[in-house]
């Protein structure tokens, strides 16, 4: 027997809401049944980006975006269920990550904020909603991120193999799975977030660097790369997590002030920043992995994947597709699985990863009735 969950994920790139319909058996083994994605309406994306970049939040704007994002989430769920002709009553729960608008695990007090009103989502879809996955880990002294390593361990662990699972989302994170069952994980720095922001800054008609054409037109600027790598996050020991609060267009433009560097050269150098920071992160692991498996939107960036393959050698590089999981849907599946963990009262965090004092069951629940 299995239960069906819908995992909803929207990352720091703020480009789309991904919905994964996942069958999960009694042992917690997931199987992707179907998926659907909805792009953010341009106005919603603009408002969310503005909110994430200001310290002066307006209550009405925050509340309005909370509702608007939940409505978009309900729409993607409805479209997904229509696609597969499955009724809402056949879904155990929606596991909604929400949209992160602030993540400050190192502030005093530490906090994180995800929007997407779960009550409206539950009533709008007729399905119970599990949400608020990050705050309990932070309350237990952790970073609240990354949360997917527990899922990676469940799905990707291989006996007598040391592997790394590297998510190339807005922010990159690595999960190390040792051959003896050990696990570590942490954010390594920016992946798509700076690359996408720089493309959009230079050409508002584009949302990302398709086929890395922009980056390939540029040349690596070693001095700029050196300045970028001086960001204090890279020198921090794990556990650690980051986000747009630290790696954003304002920070990048400060590094460019007084330097005449072409936009394409900047894009090429940002690509190298992602690849180098991942390479450096892997050198801190207790044991070098035999294979690095990549997932997330960054796997579609051919230049980034080329540089990672070159820099990580002799580590073998592949995507999670070779492990049976579509690299574009790993995170949405992971949150469906975290919803299953909540329903079955199983801890969803990994204290070795987040730095929490102990394992905790992640999330809270809103009933649809």
UniProtKB/Swiss-Prot annotation:
InterPro entries reported in the protein's UniProt record: Anhydro_N_Ac-Mur_kinase, ATPase_NBD
Q: Does the keyword Nucleotide-binding apply?
A: yes
The family database entries (Gene3D superfamilies) matched by this protein are listed as: 3.30.420.40
| Pathway assigned to this chain's UniProt record | Amino-sugar metabolism; 1,6-anhydro-N-acetylmuramate degradation; Cell wall biogenesis; peptidoglycan recycling
Return the broad EC class: transferase
Keywords in alphabetical order, please: ATP-binding, Carbohydrate metabolism, Kinase, Nucleotide-binding, Transferase
GO terms of biological process kind: 1,6-anhydro-N-acetyl-beta-muramic acid catabolic process; amino sugar metabolic process; peptidoglycan turnover
Q: Which SUPFAM superfamilies does UniProt cross-reference here?
A: Actin-like ATPase domain (SSF53067)
GO MF term set:
ATP binding; kinase activity; phosphotransferase activity, alcohol group as acceptor
Entry's family note: Belongs to the anhydro-N-acetylmuramic acid kinase family.
List, alphabetically, the HAMAP family matched.
AnhMurNAc_kinase
Q: What is this protein called?
A: Anhydro-N-acetylmuramic acid kinase
Species of origin: Idiomarina loihiensis (strain ATCC BAA-735 / DSM 15497 / L2-TR)
Chain's gene name: anmK
């Amino acid at each position: 027997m299995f239960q069906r969950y819908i995992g909803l994920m929207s990352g720091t790139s703020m480009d789309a809401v991904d919905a994964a319909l996942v069958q999960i058996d009694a042992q917690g083994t997931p199987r992707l049944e179907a998926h659907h994605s909805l792009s953010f309406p341009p106005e919603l994306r603009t408002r969310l980006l503005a909110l994430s970049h200001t310290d002066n939040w307006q209550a009405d704007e925050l509340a309005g975006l909370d509702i608007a994002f939940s409505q978009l989430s309900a729409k993607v769920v409805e479209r997904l269920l229509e696609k597969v002709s499955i009724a809402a009553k056949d879904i155990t729960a929606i596991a909604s990550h929400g949209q992160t608008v602030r993540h400050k695990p190192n502030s005093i007090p530490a906090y994180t904020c995800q929007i997407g009103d779960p009550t409206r989502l539950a009533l709008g879809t007729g399905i119970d909603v599990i949400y608020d996955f990050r705050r309990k880990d932070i309350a237990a002294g952790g970073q609240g991120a990354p949360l997917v390593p527990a899922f990676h361990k469940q799905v990707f662990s291989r006996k007598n193999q040391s592997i790394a699972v590297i998510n190339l989302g807005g922010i990159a994170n690595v999960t190390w799975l040792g051959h003896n069952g050990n696990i570590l994980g942490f954010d390594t720095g920016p992946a798509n977030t700076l690359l996408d922001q720089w493309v959009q800054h230079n050409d508002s008609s584009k949302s990302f660097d398709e086929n890395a054409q922009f980056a390939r037109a540029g040349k690596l600027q070693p001095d700029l790369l050196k300045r970028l790598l001086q960001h204090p996050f890279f020198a921090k020991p794990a556990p650690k997590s980051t986000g747009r609060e630290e790696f954003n267009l304002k920070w990048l433009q400060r590094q460019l002030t007084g330097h005449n560097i072409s936009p394409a050269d900047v894009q090429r150098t940002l690509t190298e920043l992602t690849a180098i920071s991942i390479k450096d992160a892997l050198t801190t692991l207790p044991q070098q992995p035999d294979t690095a498996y990549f997932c997330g939107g960054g796997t579609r960036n051919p230049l980034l994947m080329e540089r990672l393959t070159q820099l990580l050698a002799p580590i073998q590089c592949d995507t999670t597709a070779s492990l049976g999981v579509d690299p574009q849907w790993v995170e949405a599946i992971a949150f469906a699985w975290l919803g299953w963990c909540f329903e079955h009262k199983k801890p969803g965090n990994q204290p070795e990863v987040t730095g929490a004092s102990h394992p905790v069951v992640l999330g809270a629940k809103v009933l649809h009735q």
